[in-house]
Regions:
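Alpha-helical interface subdomain recognition
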Residues: 1-82, 104, 113, 117, ...
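Short glycine/proline-enriched turns and hinge-like loops at secondary-structure junctions
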Residues: 67, 132-134, 158-162
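N-terminal glycine-rich flavin-associated loop
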Residues: 84-105
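Short beta-strand-to-turn element immediately C-terminal to the catalytic PLP-Schiff-base lysine
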Residues: 99-102, 141, 167-170, 179-182, ...
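A short, Trp-centered hydrophobic/proline-enriched beta-strand micro-motif
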Residues: 116-126
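Cytochrome P450 C-terminal beta-domain/meander region
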Residues: 132-150
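Flexible, small-/acidic-enriched active-site or ligand-binding loops
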Residues: 135-137, 155-156, 182-214, 219-222
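A short core secondary-structure module
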Residues: 150-188
Length: 369
C-alpha cells in the first residue's frame, strides 16, 4: 500500500492559479447573477480552455499535457470553493472515458477537440436515479449499420451546451458506452430540470428515436474509470465547498453580535465550527491520498481511497452547509442568505455517484475480508 501522500509542484501551481482565477471570475455576486442563466458563460469557458485546463489529463499525443487526473484535482477543488458553474467536470470525465474506452480513431477525433474547448456531457443516470451497470434501462438496438437508441437519461449537466454526450446503453443485454453528437439530438429532446443546486444547469435527455452509426459505440466499456474519475472530481468539489462553507461561517460569526459579544465567542458555535475545520482537513487528506493512489495505477487501493474520500466528504459538506444556514439564524432560511447556496451544492454532490451510506456499504467487505 502506498504510504506517502504527495502534493506535486504541478498541483501546487495549479491550486494557486485556479484559486485566484475562480476568486476573480466567480465571486458570490456573480454566482447569484447566473442562477437563472440559460447558457454557460462562454467568455469564462474560453479562458479556461486557453489556460490549458481541459488538457491536463489528456495524453500529450492527443494535444494534452499528460499530467493525469491527479493534477485536475486542484482546479476542481477551486471551482467548488467558489461555486463556479461550468461544464468542466463533465468535460474532464468525458475525456477520461474516451482515453480509456475509445478506439484510436475516436481518441484522435475527440480528445484534441476537448482540449480546444469542445464540451462533453455524461449521460449515465436513469430515471430511477441509478447509474449502476445492471440497472441500465436505455437500449441500443442494432439496425443494419446503425443503432437506434431508446430511454431517458437524467441529471445531464450542461447538456444544452454540449458538443457530444457519452451515454450508457444496453446492447444485447450488455452495458456499453455510445458517443452521441449534439447534431444527432432532435429539437425538443432536452428538457431543463429543477434541481436542488441552482448553480447547476441540469437536463433530461430523451433518447427515443435517435440513430447513431455503429462506429459511435466506444470500443471499450471501462465503467470503473468513469466511476473513479467522477468520485475524484466530486470529492475535490466537495473539499472546495467545505472551504467556502467555513469561510462563510467564520465571517458571520466574527461579524454578528449578541449580548455585546460577537457570536463566534460562544462555545455552542465554536465547537461545531472546529468540527467543520477538522472535517475539512480530513477531507483534503482523503482527497489527495486518493489522487496519489489513482496515479499509482493500483485499482484496489484507488477504490478504497476514492470511496473513503466520497463518503467522508459527502457527510462533512452536508453538515457544514446545514450549520452555515443554522448559524445565520432566521436570515439563514431566507433566499437572500448565501449560506443556502453551499447547502444546496452539498446536497447535490452528496447523492451524485452514491452518498456516504452507499460507499460505506461497499467498503465494508473490502476492508473486513
Amino acid at each position: 500500500m502506498s504510504s506517502q501522500m504527495t502534493f506535486s509542484d504541478e498541483q501546487t501551481m495549479l491550486l494557486d492559479t485556479a484559486t485566484e482565477f475562480c476568486r476573480k471570475h466567480s465571486p458570490i455576486e456573480t454566482v447569484r447573477a447566473r442562477l437563472d442563466a440559460d447558457q454557460i458563460d462562454a467568455t469564462t469557458w474560453k479562458e479556461i480552455t486557453d489556460l490549458g485546463w481541459l488538457g491536463i489529463n489528456v495524453p500529450e499525443e492527443f494535444g494534452g499535457l499528460g499530467l493525469g487526473l491527479s493534477c485536475v484535482v486542484p482546479v476542481a477543488e477551486s471551482m467548488g470553493r467558489y461555486l463556479m458553474g461550468t461544464p468542466y467536470n463533465g468535460a474532464i470525465t468525458a475525456s477520461e472515458c474516451l482515453a480509456t474506452s475509445g478506439s484510436r480513431e475516436q481518441k484522435e477525433e475527440w480528445l484534441p477537440k476537448i482540449v480546444s474547448g469542445a464540451i462533453g456531457a455524461m449521460a449515465l443516470i436513469e430515471t430511477n436515479g441509478s447509474w449502476i451497470l445492471d440497472q441500465i434501462e436505455a437500449q441500443a438496438i442494432a439496425s443494419e449499420d446503425m443503432f437506434e437508441l431508446s430511454g431517458t437519461k437524467c441529471f445531464v449537466t450542461d447538456a444544452d451546451a454540449a458538443d457530444f454526450y457519452i451515454v450508457s446503453v444496453n446492447v444485447e443485454a450488455k452495458a456499453r458506452l455510445a458517443l452521441v453528437k449534439r447534431e444527432q439530438i432532435p429539437e425538443g429532446n432536452l428538457h431543463r430540470e429543477i434541481v436542488i443546486d441552482e448553480t447547476r444547469r441540469s437536463y433530461q435527455l430523451d433518447l427515443d428515436g435517435i440513430m447513431v452509426p455503429v462506429d459511435q459505440l466506444l470500443e471499450g466499456s471501462d465503467f470503473q474509470a468513469i466511476e473513479f474519475a467522477s468520485l475524484l472530481l466530486l470529492s475535490a468539489e466537495i473539499t472546495g465547498g467545505l472551504v467556502g462553507s467555513i469561510h462563510t461561517i467564520v465571517e458571520y460569526l466574527n461579524t454578528r453580535r449578541a449580548f455585546d459579544k460577537v457570536i463566534g465567542s460562544y462555545q455552542a458555535l465554536k465547537h461545531p465550527t472546529v468540527k467543520i475545520l477538522l472535517d475539512l482537513e480530513a477531507s483534503r487528506s482523503h482527497l489527495y491520498h486518493a489522487a496519489t493512489v489513482l496515479a499509482d495505477d493500483n485499482a484496489g487501493e484507488a477504490e478504497i481511497a476514492l470511496r473513503m474520500a466520497k463518503a467522508h466528504g459527502s457527510a462533512a459538506f452536508a453538515f457544514a452547509g446545514d450549520r452555515a444556514v443554522q448559524f445565520h439564524g432566521g436570515f439563514g432560511f431566507t433566499y437572500d442568505c448565501d449560506a443556502q447556496l453551499y447547502l444546496r451544492r452539498a446536497l447535490w454532490c452528496q447523492y451524485q455517484f452514491g452518498d456516504e451510506a452507499y460507499h460505506r456499504q461497499l467498503l465494508e467487505p473490502i476492508l473486513l475480508d
